[in-house]
């Protein structure tokens, strides 16, 4: 059977130094373990074709579909603050682009498809565990309503990869509105190739910000637009307790999507200094640091764009600084608006931010679970019964003091308790991809070739705001012996 991909490839029309043409490396015995049928249909693909052996071969990189022009993209990046002038797709191949049913151009990339000219002595492969982690978490983020790359398919290769021990190999088919990163701009800026920076900026404007084309100062507007999307994205992360774990500039998408999940994790007990990533030794990318790091990354983007702002360097710097100054205000506005919604506040008052901070302080002191605290507050807002929330706090004294202030604040809101409860439940999920659940899924798949736990967790996370009483245990935090203290990149 022929598997049809309606490719329309634009990135390969850019100069040859933007990428390396490279085909995926064939694998021994590809087997499809998960296809995202709704996403396939959204992309204009036929799920029935993709579920055939021929489809599995394409999704594993064993064969290249008609119309594909496989490439590895060039980029640089700051990794934990240290600049690396050449990174690039070291284990991923962009097959091409399709225009989805909403008219949006989307990349289709194979991750773990073999070595490329950018592999830096790596084998270009992916182990099954990291593939399942990214599939679960990226699709959970999409269900939560957070901009993200998507997962179209996961395939085991029939081969082993070696990461200290032998592990099953796998390939993830990742979908993104593009894979252009801050580090892509840095790649050309580091080479003082201003014309390439301009070509890339024009491409990004045409693809992601078409309203800016033809404006008087399109490159200034591009920087401002990327800043706005990143400010909103980071606010979204913090509102669900998400920790990216490796916020390097090469993992910062100019489209405003979450990308490169690696050692990501969701908080259980609230701790603003929480770090899970095993490689984040000094807490650079800790939960509460994420807005500051996003601002740092955007400053690196601004540096790349400065030559496009005009010949007066001092004036260009001032204009870039003005744009960057907008990040803090936009992040704060998005974050505080989100916190008001999470607390059931429909109007804005001066004391709202201190009220939210007081709850976080009480949660940190008493090690209360982040997700369950807000979910149970949603129900308490309807019933008035705070006991289910109190039970989450080792010492509820701080919570009791806060709850009295919260109830006073709710008293001046116009909504009924039932309206408030319904609104809060739409923004306070019951289910997140908890770390111990993900680890259990990976263990079952890697050790026993058992994907039933993966399927069940994925199904639960597809409806994060629903109660799902028959799956209530998935909402619970880990027992002490189940806690995951570190996550790993897997590369």
From Swiss-Prot:
Co-factor requirement: Mg(2+); Mn(2+)
Keyword Ribonucleoprotein included in the entry's annotation: no
Active-site positions on this chain: 250 (proton acceptor)
Recorded catalytic activity of this chain's protein: L-seryl-[protein] + ATP = 3-O-(5'-adenylyl)-L-seryl-[protein] + diphosphate; L-threonyl-[protein] + ATP = 3-O-(5'-adenylyl)-L-threonyl-[protein] + diphosphate; L-tyrosyl-[protein] + ATP = O-(5'-adenylyl)-L-tyrosyl-[protein] + diphosphate; L-histidyl-[protein] + UTP = N(tele)-(5'-uridylyl)-L-histidyl-[protein] + diphosphate
InterPro entries per record: SelO
Highest taxon in the source lineage: Bacteria
Keyword Manganese tagged: yes
Residues annotated for Mg(2+) binding in this entry: 251, 260
Sequence segments annotated as region (Disordered): 466-491
EC number(s) reported in the record: 2.7.7.-, 2.7.7.108
Assigned keywords, A-Z: ATP-binding, Magnesium, Manganese, Metal-binding, Nucleotide-binding, Nucleotidyltransferase, Transferase
Family named by the database record: Belongs to the SELO family.
HAMAP family: YdiU_SelO
NCBIfam families (UniProt xref): PRK00029.1
Matches recorded under PANTHER family: PROTEIN ADENYLYLTRANSFERASE SELO, MITOCHONDRIAL (PTHR32057:SF14)
Biological role: Nucleotidyltransferase involved in the post-translational modification of proteins. It can catalyze the addition of adenosine monophosphate (AMP) or uridine monophosphate (UMP) to a protein, resulting in modifications known as AMPylation and UMPylation.
Protein name according to UniProt: Protein nucleotidyltransferase YdiU
Gene that this polypeptide is encoded by: ydiU
